[in-house]
């Protein structure tokens, strides 16, 4: 049986491909995706948002009589302290209560609340239109992107950008909060494992039970900072490898400079550079995914990550 797959964000860091259509926004990207055997479709998703995708998929499903699927990419932030998620215990991605937990979450950050709402809307609308939905969650992803587009990630990049601008590595959290991590290859293999299972016609947990965190485990932010600070000091990007707290009101000038370096509102600096997330990956292993890299690998890879980011910034 043949399937059609539409991938959005194909030019991004996490973009993957198969037998597919790829959403692009420029002629150059269209040429690039053709080299991967994909047919480019050019449009802007701000115009055709998730709800429209799902509604249209629902029509495809009822006309063809075949199962249709929608895989939404979210992020671990949506399951963290920043998003009002519980952090006093491991939050398992196969917890049958996760949908209700997400429904009850309240975030003081509008953008994060919108991302929480997006997950809930995808699940609800998909259910309504007979579409099977999956919420795929990357976390701190590291390693070189293998696609034709963006080669570098998000959170490790924010650490380097802030350090470069301030010539020092600052931490913005009290205590020792941790966050799940994942090598880009493992992130991709979970995505592909989900696709493989769906295409094989298997009844993969979906809808309210369809959350998939791509992570081999968590690390403490400060350990990541320390490893990256050593790599940054070695390259004279920062004066020395010490990680300095920037937490209170007396540090507001420092936080203002970090804000400027990251190009985000001041209250979003801790969202970009820290926070606590106890989201824990179980679902992936249940569908046969086995990550290759343990969480500590990000610390060993910090030197290469810094090199990669500095080369691509
Ligand atoms: N990388 C991580 O560590 C990480 C962690 C957690 C969650 N995530 C989430 O995963 C998703 C993908 O991340 P990424 O690292 O691959 O991001 P990225 O490198 O910035 O790529 C974003 C992709 O989305 C496309 N895009 C953005 N706005 C669009 C629009 N309005 N219409 C059509 N296409 C649009 C971009 O196309 P152009 O090339 O044309 O701009 C690009 O292909 C994001 O939602 C991100 O928040 C990523």
Predicted features along the sequence, with ranges:
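N-terminal Rossmann NAD(P)H-binding glycine-rich loop of SDR-like oxidoreductase domains
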Residues: 2-19
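Conserved Rossmann-fold NAD(P)-dependent oxidoreductase catalytic core, especially the SDR/UDP-sugar
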Residues: 21, 56-117, 126, 134-137, ...
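NAD(P)H-binding glycine-rich loop region in Rossmannoid oxidoreductase-like domains
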Residues: 24-66, 74, 78-79
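Flexible, glycine-rich beta-alpha linker
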Residues: 131-157, 172, 177
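A conserved pocket-lining segment of Rossmann-fold NAD(P)-dependent short-chain dehydrogenase/reductase
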Residues: 158-185, 190-194, 198, 204-207
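Non-catalytic, hydrophobic alpha-helical segments
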Residues: 187-191, 214, 224, 284, ...
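Terminal hydrophobic/aromatic helix or amphipathic segment near a protein terminus
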Residues: 204, 213-278
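Amphipathic terminal alpha-helices
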Residues: 285, 292-313
């Amino acid at each position: 049986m043949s399937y059609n797959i539409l991938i959005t964000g194909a030019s991004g860091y996490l973009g993957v491909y198969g037998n597919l259509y790829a959403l692009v926004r420029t002629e150059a990207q269209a040429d690039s995706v053709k080299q991967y055997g994909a047919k480019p479709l050019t449009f802007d998703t701000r115009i055709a948002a998730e709800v429209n995708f799902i509604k249209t998929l629902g029509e495809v499903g009822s006309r063809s009589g075949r199962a249709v699927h929608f895989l939404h990419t979210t992020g671990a932030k949506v399951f963290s302290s920043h998003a009002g998620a519980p952090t006093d215990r491991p939050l398992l991605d196969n917890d049958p209560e996760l949908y209700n937990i997400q429904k009850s979450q309240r975030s003081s950050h509008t953008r994060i609340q919108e991302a929480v709402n997006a997950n809930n809307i995808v699940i609800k609308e998909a259910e309504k239109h007979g579409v099977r939905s999956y919420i795929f969650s990357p976390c701190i992803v590291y390693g070189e992107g293998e696609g034709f587009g963006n080669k570098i990630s998000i959170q490790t990049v924010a650490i380097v950008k802030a350090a470069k601008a301030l010539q020092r590595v600052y931490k913005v959290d009290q205590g020792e909060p941790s966050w799940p991590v994942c090598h880009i290859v493992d992130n991709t293999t979970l995505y592909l494992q989900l696709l493989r299972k769906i295409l094989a016609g298997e009844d993969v947990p979906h809808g309210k039970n369809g959350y998939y965190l791509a992570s081999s485990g968590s690390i403490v932010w400060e350990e990541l900072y320390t490893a990256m600070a050593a790599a940054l000091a070695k390259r004279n990007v920062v004066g020395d490898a010490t990680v300095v707290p920037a937490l209170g009101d007396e540090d507001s000038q420092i936080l203002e400079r970090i804000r400027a370096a990251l190009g985000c509102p001041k209250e979003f600096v801790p969202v970009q550079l820290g926070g606590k997330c106890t989201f824990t990956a179980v679902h992936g292993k249940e569908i046969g995914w086995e990550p290759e890299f343990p969480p500590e690998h990000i610390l060993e890879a910090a030197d290469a990550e810094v090199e990669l980011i500095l080369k691509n910034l």
